[in-house]
Each structure stands twice: as C-alpha cells, then as structure tokens.
C-alpha cells in the first residue's frame, strides 16, 4: 500500500492544495508554520480517522477549518448553502477494495476520504437556529456530519481497514497516566501475532492463579459472611480481559523503568525503531515528527542509520529541521512546504550520493532561504556582513539574506540544490588568478538558471577577497596604513611600517595573506576580518562586493 497524493480542501492553512508524494520516503521541510505538521495531521486523519492520537469525531472543532473559508461564510447570509465543506482525500495504491470515482479528479482510482459537511437532515433545524441566532461568529459544527469513505463511497470501518498507518509522537504519552492506548499501539508493533496470543493466554492463566490464591480466598470468605449486602456470593477477582485487550494492561520498560517515565529522546528512539522493525509485519506506513528532537548527534546518527537500513518497503513520512537527517535519508526525498510545494525527486543522483556520504552540509539553509550568498571562507562572511551593516545599520540575516560558508564540493552541491528549488543564490568566488578560466567559463554552466549568479573580481591580480580589499585601500599611503593598522598585529605592522613606498607596502600585505597549500594563513584572514568587523574604520572595498547583495 502506498499513499500517492493527498488533496486538502479547507483544512487549516490549506484552502485548496494537492500534494504528491514519493513511494518510499517523504521528508517535509519548511519554515515554522509553513504547514509541514498540518500535512502529517491530515494524513493521520484520513488514514486512521484520528487527530492528535484521539478519534477524529471527538476532536473535531471549528478551528480546523481554513480561515479564508470561515471568513467567506461569516461575510455571507450564513445560510446552509454557504457552510464550507472540509475534505481530505488520500489517493492510494495497493488497495483495490477502495476503488471508485468519488474524488476531486473524478478519476477511477483507489483512495479514501474524510468528508466534513452540513447534515442535510438538519436543514430545517438550522434554519430555525439562524432566525433566532443571526450573529453566528464561527462555523456551527453541531450541524455537521463527519464521514469516512472510500472512493466507491462506502463507509470505511477501522476494524476492517485494509492497511495500517502508525503515527509516532512521544508527546502523546502522558507522564502520569501510564498504560494508555498509545503505548498499546507501540506494543503491537513489537510483538509477533503468535507472541501476543501466548502472552494473552499466559496472562489470563495467571489471573486465575491470583483468584485461587490463599490470600484472595481469605478475603472473599470474610467479604459478606452475613449476606447483608446480597443473598448471593460476593467476591473479588482479577478482571477478565476480552481478547485483544491485554496490551492495555501491559507496559514497556527500559532498564526496568516504565516507558512513560524514560527520557523523551529514548522514547522517540524506541518507538521509531519498533515501528520500523514491525515484527507483526502489518504496518504499511509510518509518520513521525522531527526524529532529531531530544537526541544527541551521535544517537541521531545511529537512529538515522537504523531507519535507512531497516525501513524495508514501508512508506515513511517525517518532518525535520535537521540537514543531517535529510541528507542521510536522501535529499531528493525532500517535500518543500514553503510558498507552494515542491519535491526534489529530479535532483542529480551524484548530488544525492555526495550528501549521503558527507551529510554534514547545511543544505536545509539553501532549501529554506529565499536569498543566499555562498562564500569560500569565514573571513568573506565577516567582511560582507560589515559592509552590509555599514550601509543598512543591520545584518543581512535580519533582511532574509543568508550567508553560507562552503568549501570544496560544497559550491556545486549547494548550487545544485538551489537550482532545483529556485532559491536565488549569489556566489562570491575567488578567480584564483585566472578570471576567464575560473569564473567566465563556470558562469556558462549556470546560464540557463537566472537565480544563480557568480560574482568575482575581473582582475587577475585580485585573486581572492584579501588582495581585492588591499587594492581598494591602496589609493594612497594614509588610507592603506589605516587599513594595515587594523588588520595586522602590532608586531607585523612594525614590519610593514619599515617598507618604503605604497606599492611595496601593498605587496607586503598581499603576500602576508597569500594562502598556499598548508601554510596555515587562513587563521590570519579570519583574525583580520574579525578586527574589521569589530572596528570602526570606514575602509574601502571593491565595487563587485556591492553586487553580491543584488538579487534583482
């Protein structure tokens, strides 16, 4: 069984949206309040008829209606014809019993629907209510009916459902209630069916042993000896559980500690692994919120590795704010929920492979940012931030511009992700002494993508940011000396001060910052950039750095 797509109508922030999914893994990413969790909630409602772990009909409130739909209703005459309909339609594959044409596409397809609409049998009652209460301020859900139907328009029964979907959320475990239905659901995933049968029989036999114990018999003998309560025999006995209910009387323990009292991170870890392992072999789909929550990086690494290797053929839906999770589970499984909806299923396989091997790249920043500047080192980042702050009296990130330091294969990787998503990316690149070869020719590779722009000095002698900054401040000795005074240590400045003329002082500075393999001058660059960032010098800079902030 696979969920191919879901159609949301008037559900929370989604007025009319259709989301297509991957058959294996779906990783929802987006800003806070973008709607990632809302899609998971919709899946839980339509697949399990459950909302936040409880039956949907008992949790149904006016708050789940789309605000625009509510406002349209409140602005109308509020008659029954203007009451909004809420629908969640899941198009699925592998369940032919749910085939029909009752879906928004009117297509012959397999699927199920949760339909929330006005109950026509209450039409007259609602009309009378409207006469006496014309100033309705919310959706009158008391006049609605909730239906769970397949695409053939047949009611879906939970006990006879043709698939099983599990939603993992440790926050649903109440710390004091202990043995609840949620834990019993997790237990079901941990036990084979034959194991559950054996446990049930053994549990019931032990109940009978308890009932026949001497202590219980003694209590029962003296319970109503004079028959003042009833003329019949009154006794105390262990409750006999119906078949299938034993799970509610059992609990998971970790190192002898009840599951509901262990740490949230371990709860999440155990639940996810049990669901993925699924000894009962009856789970088709697993949903989870931010598996990285409450986990250290090492434990997250172990968990992601487990999911990656043990998922089998289960379809997985999860939300995350972790670049590590999405890189390791495959970045081409991203479902970006932000100013629309976009999947990265067409991302180049080489990029996917690189990020699986090197999952530390913070690719999520490229996915979530609208404006990105890629730079080669932290010194570039500091200088750019100082320039921007000088002009605007605030840092670029305060205006939604994210400066990301990348190295080596990072440029191509980040640019590939940005090309697929459409993120506007300006790349500040060193020309390394050959502008034509290292910049002009590379630009040609991205000519078809107007959202990608490579920026560099066109002068070969300005081979990186440091010489470009030095040339910009070498207009005269006073300006260059002031610049050198800030970026150099006192000891180095004394050496610089012994150099006789402007050109030689400029060359001294360029050579001082020139990096070659293994000379460790990167630290000098960062130290000097920090001094510029923290200082008050109104230094000069090359004009191409202004272009870095131009996203027009």
Regions of interest found by a model, annotated:
Residues 42-106:
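Conserved P-loop NTP-binding catalytic core
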Residues 79-83, 104-107, 276-281, 308-312, ...:
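Conserved catalytic network of the ASCE P-loop NTPase/AAA+ motor domain
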Residues 93-214:
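Electropositive, glycine-dotted interaction segments
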Residues 187-270, 274-285:
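Extended helical coiled-coil dimerization/tether regions that scaffold
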Residues 62-78, 349-368:
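Surface-exposed acidic, glycine/proline-enriched linker/cap segments
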Residues 1-48, 245-366, 381-385, 389, ...:
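Switch/communication elements of ASCE P-loop NTPase nucleotide-binding domains
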Residues 362-372, 381-552:
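Acidic, Mg2+-coordinating catalytic modules of nucleic-acid enzymes
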Residues 94-96, 117-122, 152-153, 292, ...:
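Conserved nucleotide-binding/hydrolysis micro-motifs of P-loop NTPases
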């Amino acid at each position: 069984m696979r969920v191919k797509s879901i159609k949301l109508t008037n559900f929370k922030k989604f007025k009319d949206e259709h989301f297509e999914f991957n058959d294996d893994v779906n990783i929802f990413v987006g800003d806070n309040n973008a709607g990632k969790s809302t899609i998971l909630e919709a899946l839980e409602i339509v697949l399990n008829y459950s909302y936040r772990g409880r039956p949907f009909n008992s949790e149904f409130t006016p708050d789940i209606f789309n605000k625009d739909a509510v406002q349209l209703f409140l602005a109308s005459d509020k008659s029954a014809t203007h009451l909004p309909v809420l629908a969640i339609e899941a198009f699925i594959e592998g369940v032919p019993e749910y085939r029909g044409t009752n879906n928004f596409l009117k297509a012959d397809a397999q699927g199920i629907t949760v339909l929330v609409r006005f109950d026509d049998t209450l039409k007259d009652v609602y009309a009378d209510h409207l006469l006496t209460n014309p100033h309705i301020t919310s959706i009158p859900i008391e006049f609605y009916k909730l239906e769970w139907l397949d695409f053939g328009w047949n009611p879906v029964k939970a006990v006879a459902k043709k698939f099983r979907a599990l939603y993992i959320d440790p926050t649903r475990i109440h710390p004091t209630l202990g043995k609840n239905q949620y834990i019993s659901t997790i237990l079901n995933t941990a036990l084979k069916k034959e194991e559950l049968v054996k446990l049930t029989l053994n549990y019931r036999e032990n109940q009978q042993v308890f009932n026949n114990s001497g202590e219980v018999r003694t209590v029962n003998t003296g319970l109503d000896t004079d028959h003042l309560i009833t003329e019949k025999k009154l006794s105390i006995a262990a409750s006999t559980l119906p078949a299938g209910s034993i799970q509610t009387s059992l609990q998971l323990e970790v190192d002898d500690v009840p599951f509901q009292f262990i740490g949230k991170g371990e709860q999440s870890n155990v639940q996810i692994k049990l669901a993925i392992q699924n000894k009962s072999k009856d789970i088709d789909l697993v949903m989870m919120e931010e598996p990285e929550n409450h986990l250290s990086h090492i434990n997250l690494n172990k968990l992601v590795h487990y999911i990656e290797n043990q998922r089998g053929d289960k379809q997985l839906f999860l939300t995350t704010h972790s670049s590590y999770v999405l890189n390791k589970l495959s970045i081409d499984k991203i479902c970006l929920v932000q100013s629309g909806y976009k999947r990265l299923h067409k991302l180049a396989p080489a990029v996917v492979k690189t990020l699986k091997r090197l999952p530390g790249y913070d690719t999520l920043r490229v996915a979530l940012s609208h404006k990105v500047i890629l730079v080669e080192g932290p010194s570039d980042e500091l200088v750019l931030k100082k320039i921007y702050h000088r002009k605007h009296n605030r840092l670029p990130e305060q205006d939604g511009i994210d400066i990301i330091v990348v190295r080596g294969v990072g440029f191509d990787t980040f640019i590939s992700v940005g090309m697929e998503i459409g993120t506007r990316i300006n790349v500040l690149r060193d020309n390394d002494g050959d502008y034509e070869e290292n910049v002009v020719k590379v630009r040609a590779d991205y000519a078809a993508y107007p959202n990608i722009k490579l920026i560099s000095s066109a002068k070969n002698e300005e081979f990186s940011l440091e010489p470009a900054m030095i040339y910009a401040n070498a207009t005269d000795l006073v300006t260059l000396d002031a610049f050198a005074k800030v970026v150099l240590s006192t000891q180095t400045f004394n050496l610089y001060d012994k150099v006789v003329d402007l050109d030689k002082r400029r060359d001294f500075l360029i050579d001082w910052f020139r990096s070659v393999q293994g000379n460790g001058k990167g630290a000098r660059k960062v130290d000097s950039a920090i001094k510029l960032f923290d200082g008050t010098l109104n230094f000069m800079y090359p004009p191409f750095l202004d272009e870095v902030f131009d996203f027009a």
